Amino acid sequence: MVVLDASIVNIALPKAASDLNISPDNYQWAVTAYLLTFGGFLLLGGRIADFVGRRKVFMFGLSGFAAASVLGGVAQNQGMLYGARALQGLFGALLAPAALSLISVTFTDSKERAKAFAVYGALSGVGASIGLILGGALTQYWGWRWCLFVNAPLAVVAVLLAIRNVTESKVSGDTRYDVPGAVTATVGMLAVVYGVSQASTYGWHAAKSWGFIAPGFVLLTLFIFIESKVTNPLFPLRLLTRIRSGAYASQLLSSTGLYGLFLFMTFYFQDVLGYSAVKAGLCFLPFSLGIIVSATVASHLLPKVGPRPIGTVGLSMAAIGLLLLSTLSVHVPYLTHVALPMLTMSLGLGQVFVASSSTALFNTPPHDTGAASALLNTTQQVGGSFGTAIQNTIFATALASYLASHHVMDKPMPALIGDAKVHGFDMAFRFGSLALAISAVLFFVMVNIDRHHLGQHDESANVFI
């Protein structure tokens, strides 16, 4: 539901902005409000799930996320929409780590756990891809508000299934909260994510950006120091083994490279080409099909070959696909210049979703599954925030440069602006492709486990910090 919402809202935003009179300067806040609370509270949410009870927190997160979605669906102004999106992020920060940690503690057999992680990763990929098509259809025929309302029935079904099938689990022993760690981590993450979002508007050198980013990193550094000293840390540094660190680092970089894709391609289809919301959603069909096929295949392969080859090949394919997409222009054949690159990329990403979710919780002690799950989601959100800001900066710079160098051309201004926008998209995609390529190398070098190790406990795993 969380990944579905992230992609479905991208398609709905242009219509929502028009209905609620949201200016271009404030457009990003519909996304930023969600990222702020989701990224800022994930680590705390993971620990709450461990201590209060993963099933209880999972169901509470589901219910709150659904209620916030309904609030956003009835929004009458931009402030109400932003508030609802912030609440969605807050409840999502409880829901996401609780869901992943429940898998880890529910499936104790190594092969069954590997299959469960594979299914979780596959569903994450499928949810994101289906959201693009569903968002277009809902926006076109029922209105953008239904892109938020749709979460309510999904949550009801999920809660009923959880009541019937999920047993409660929580840690025993010392469950005192690491208050200094919670404060420094949460405020630090909020500051970094907010500062990065400001950078996409005001630039990386602006005081409005670094005035938040720098203090945020100071607080996060202090958080690491605190975690090394306290007896019951919010995030136990013992979790940062070579293998899990590789999974987290590759997740951070791959999210940095990918998050701008959906935003830019949505504007390419709707703004540059003038497609309707439903047609724009259908243009993502090759991406959706590729995710479904590759995630399904990878979920069967994971217990047989392990995550290392699956993740490495997947990230490499995604990098190649995004590089091919950087040859985009206004007048190019859809099949060869859009559909084929998207298909290549998605055939890789489906594998990545499966491999990363299983590796991030590899050999995690039951006491720490919520914290480990939270860090995986945190790296994804922080990487996405950085990636979107960096790619927006690249896009804006490339657009301005293109207009400056082509303004003397005998070409109508609307057509010239369209060409300039696509040139900006291409430059942003090249950066994203590089980030994915580096992520593939990291995954290959650091995630050195095979199928035989998936269910074994490795006492010799090196801790990085």
Predicted regions and their residues:
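Small-residue-rich transmembrane alpha-helices and their cytosolic helix-loop interfaces
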Residues: 31, 35, 115-129, 178, ...
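C-terminal membrane-cytosol helix-exit motif in multi-pass small-molecule transporters
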Residues: 152-170, 186-198, 215-230, 439-449
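Residue-level recognition of transmembrane alpha-helices
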Residues: 31, 61-65, 85, 142, ...
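Flexible interhelical linker loops that connect adjacent transmembrane helices
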Residues: 159-186, 228-243, 303-304, 454-458
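12-transmembrane solute porter fold
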Residues: 1-4, 9-11, 24, 205-215, ...
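Transmembrane-helix bundle of Major Facilitator Superfamily
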Residues: 1-164, 298, 305, 326, ...
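Intrinsic disorder in cytosolic terminal tails and internal cytosolic loops
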Residues: 171, 411-418, 446-465
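Hydrophobic alpha-helix/TM-entry signal in multi-pass membrane transporters
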Residues: 58, 65, 81, 177, ...
